[in-house]
């Protein structure tokens, strides 16, 4: 008998077949640089910087930006941001710069130029008669790359969030060492015709390059990161959520994974952890792998590890974390099952801790404590008297740990307890739920059961 087949009748005729469904055909690509070549983009002919500045500023005021021209200008303007490398900087086997080297963002990528001239039109109606200063160049660069951050803010229910961000960015780039170039609300108005610029490959690479540079190099103009910081760990929300989760519950990655009682975690954990990437290397290309074009379909995104992502944020919801309540549920990754496991794990770690004495008056007291521990004599609670028997589970080692949690789930038939449901409803009902968020899911799923 073939375990993959089902048998049924059609018009009294027995049919045996193997059900086939649509599966994910995308190949997850790890962002390793194997040929020791820096990320590369191709742009038009290098412009005259002063002419390019006047054209880019004019087009911003006229809300008629040309992405090819602006990318060409952003690449050429990298020369204004020279800094000193504080130590040898390597990534994926490549030497980016040596200690004390003078470098610019241009040092991080390879930019090829063609002979194609840019448009460099003066669409704003007013032509500058003088050449721009260095501060004016850096201010315009800051405004242009900020279009990346604004274009990453999506959704209909953001309220005034995007407008407030745009206004704050404008304030930064009209304050020293920058200078005011545009009128109030110009950035938000301009963004509306550039709402999809985060999908333009060259613009994305340039934004990531500027962010990688300023995250490493102390610089007068480092505030430019206000517009590019979203390129760091882009399409990496699954791995970022997992990292935050293990810090939140104060466990190692190995200890945390022991609590993941579901078969669908197996492939996701393998995918997320086996890539042998520079996840722990400071200032690596890995941090900006998506914006620098080093990976097509990220193995670290929320969709790539959807069950893991759902579980982590259901635990976060149980603990009342706003970020988790606002996050978007991955609907195709068993959210109902993950909410059950999330309730048990939330209950396991919420309002409890593992404590021990770590500081002592002198070495003699330390030695006495260690000797007592060796003989299994608990002196850690000596100053607190006895433990109430009603709270015994909170202090009993046998009641904590993955085995204990798994046993509780099995004893309850894989269903949430009433106390778990009440907690979920409590945190979600007091929160203004965004569409498709975890808060909305919990409200719709459990509010009638509380």
Swiss-Prot record:
Q: Does the keyword Ribonucleoprotein apply?
A: yes
Q: Which domain of life is it from?
A: Viruses
Q: How is it modified after translation?
A: Phosphorylated by host CK2. Unphosphorylated protein N seems to have a better affinity for leader viral promoter encapsidation. Phosphorylation of protein N in ribonucleocapsid may stabilize the interaction with protein P, thereby playing an important role in viral transcription/replication.
Quote the subcellular location field of this record: Virion; Host cytoplasm
Tell whether Transcription is among the UniProt keywords.
Answer: no
Q: Which GO terms describe its molecular function?
A: RNA binding
Q: Summarize the protein's role.
A: Encapsidates the genome in a ratio of one protein N per nine ribonucleotides, protecting it from nucleases. If expressed without protein P it binds non-specifically RNA and therefore can bind it's own mRNA. Interaction with protein P abolishes any non-specific RNA binding, and prevents phosphorylation. The soluble N-P complex encapsidates specifically the genomic RNA, with protein N protecting the genome like a pearl necklace. The encapsidated genomic RNA is termed the nucleocapsid (NC) and serves as template for viral transcription and replication.
Kindly provide the name given to this protein in its UniProt entry.
Nucleoprotein
Q: List the lineage, top down.
A: Viruses, Riboviria, Orthornavirae, Negarnaviricota, Haploviricotina
Name the gene behind this protein: N
């Amino acid at each position: 008998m073939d375990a993959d087949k089902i048998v049924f009748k059609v018009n009294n005729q027995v049919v045996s077949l193997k059900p086939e469904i649509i599966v994910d055909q995308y190949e997850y690509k790890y962002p390793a640089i194997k040929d020791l070549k820096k990320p590369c983009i191709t742009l038009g002919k290098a412009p005259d910087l002063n002419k390019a500045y006047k054209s880019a500023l004019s087009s911003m005021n006229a809300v008629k930006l040309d992405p090819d021209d602006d990318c060409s200008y952003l690449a050429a303007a990298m020369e204004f941001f020279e800094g000193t490398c504080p130590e040898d900087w390597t990534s994926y086997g490549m030497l980016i710069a040596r200690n004390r080297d003078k470098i610019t963002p241009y040092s991080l990528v390879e930019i090829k130029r063609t002979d194609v001239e840019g448009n460099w039109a003066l669409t704003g109606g007013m032509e500058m008669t003088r050449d721009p200063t260095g501060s004016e160049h850096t201010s315009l660069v800051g405004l242009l790359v900020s279009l990346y951050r604004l274009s990453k803010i999506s959704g209909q229910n953001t309220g005034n969030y995007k407008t407030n961000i745009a206004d704050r960015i404008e304030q930064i780039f009209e304050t020293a060492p920058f200078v005011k170039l545009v009128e109030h609300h110009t950035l938000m108005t301009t963004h509306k015709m550039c709402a999809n610029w985060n999908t333009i490959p060259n613009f994305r690479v340039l934004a990531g390059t500027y962010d990688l540079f300023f995250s490493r190099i102390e610089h007068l103009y480092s505030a430019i990161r206000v517009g590019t910081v979203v390129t760091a760990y882009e399409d990496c929300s699954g791995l970022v959520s997992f990292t935050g989760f293990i810090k939140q519950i104060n466990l190692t990655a190995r200890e945390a994974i022991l609590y993941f009682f579901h078969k669908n975690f197996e492939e996701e954990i393998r995918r997320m952890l086996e890539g042998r990437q520079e996840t722990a290397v400071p200032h690596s290309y890995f941090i900006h792998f998506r914006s620098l074009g080093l990976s097509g379909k990220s193995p670290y995104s929320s969709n790539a590890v959807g069950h893991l992502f759902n579980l982590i944020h259901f635990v976060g919801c149980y603990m009342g974390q706003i970020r988790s309540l606002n996050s978007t549920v991955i609907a195709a990754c068993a959210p109902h099952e993950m909410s059950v496991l999330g309730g048990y794990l939330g209950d396991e770690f919420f309002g409890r801790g593992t404590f021990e004495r770590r500081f002592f008056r002198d070495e003699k007291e330390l030695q006495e404590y260690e000797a007592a521990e060796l003989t299994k004599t608990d002196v850690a609670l000596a100053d607190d008297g006895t433990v109430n028997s009603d709270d015994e589970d909170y202090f009993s080692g046998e009641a904590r740990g993955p085995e204990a949690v798994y046993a509780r789930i099995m004893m309850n038939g894989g269903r949430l307890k009433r106390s778990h449901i009440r907690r979920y409803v409590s945190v979600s009902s007091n929160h203004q739920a965004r569409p498709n968020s975890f808060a909305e899911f919990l409200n719709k799923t459990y509010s009638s059961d509380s």
